[in-house]
Amino acid sequence: MIQDTIRKVVSMQDLAPDEARDLMTSIADGKVTDAQIGSILTALSMKGVTAHEITAFAHVLRDRAVQLKTDTSGTFVDTCGTGGDGAHTFNISTAAALVAAAAGVRVVKHGNRGVSSRSGSADVLEALGIPITLTPEEAAASVSSHNIAFLFAPGYHPAIGRVASARREIGFFSVFNILGPLLNPAGASARLIGVGDTRHIPSITGALANLGVSHAMVVHGDGTDEITITGETEVYELSGGTICRYTLTPEEFGIRRVSRETIAGGSPAENAEIIMDIFSGRKGPCRDIVLLNAAAAIYLGEKATCIYDGYRIAREVVDSGQAYRLVMALRRTT
């Protein structure tokens, strides 16, 4: 009974894997009311979710997702964040994904419109003139021709649509913010995932390992779900089943620390303008933070031996105009 599960979570008890699986199955199959979903999400947020719970939830939702099959093998990278950090930065991970793709990394970016922010990845890509509602066949073709495709979450995860109303009504960070970055329909084997709350880093990293992701960096930078230039970034790197924890600083890359206001964003149109200014050669903090996050994606995509080498490559890609030309090419696919 769903009421028994709610009572267990409310009493701060962790769910066994089979209990978590049954709960998400009931939600995905539409057997749970919005009121019950709201209760579950609230209770899970208060208790905190474990790696095993996240893994079980993700398995259920991935089994129901529209899958993307490509005609190429090898490493695919996704760059995304949990959101909910309240930092109001521009769409850094989206810009970083474009730079990584221009560097030759195959990127399958999975995302949505903004929920807790003014501009989600889908919103800014739309403002850039890049198509966001690709069919699986169109997405596979885009990866083959341009190294990148955007997978609009509602088109690939119909089961998640069943919780949309309840999520809007409760209006706070929930387990679905955590699940989103784990549900890439292409099964991307490498992930750069930003986490807005450090409490979730260990459980997300553990879930990635349980889900078979071979290489990932789970990052939190000075209160944001990005690798930051405003302070230190905490990193959990998963590689070959082993998790290594370390910190990164802007100074390691020759970048001067700045205030968060210098990397603030706005509307989708404003964020698109920031990105195109960067790709057109404008220097400054916004460019620096995009290069730093792109460096991680390039490293994860096996186009660099380390993140420092990835930073050099990202800088060359932007300075040479390759990232700008990629946006122009993607616009022509509409």
From Swiss-Prot:
EC number: 2.4.2.18
Keyword line: Amino-acid biosynthesis, Aromatic amino acid biosynthesis, Glycosyltransferase, Magnesium, Metal-binding, Transferase, Tryptophan biosynthesis
GO molecular function: anthranilate phosphoribosyltransferase activity; magnesium ion binding
Residues the record lists as binding 5-phospho-alpha-D-ribose 1-diphosphate: 81, 84-85, 89, 91-94, 109-117, 121
Any one GO BP annotation for this protein: L-tryptophan biosynthetic process
Purpose: Catalyzes the transfer of the phosphoribosyl group of 5-phosphorylribose-1-pyrophosphate (PRPP) to anthranilate to yield N-(5'-phosphoribosyl)-anthranilate (PRA).
PANTHER family assigned to the protein according to its UniProt record, in alphabetical order: ANTHRANILATE PHOSPHORIBOSYLTRANSFERASE
Protein name, UniProt field: Anthranilate phosphoribosyltransferase
Lineage, highest ranks first: Archaea, Methanobacteriati, Methanobacteriota, Stenosarchaea group, Methanomicrobia
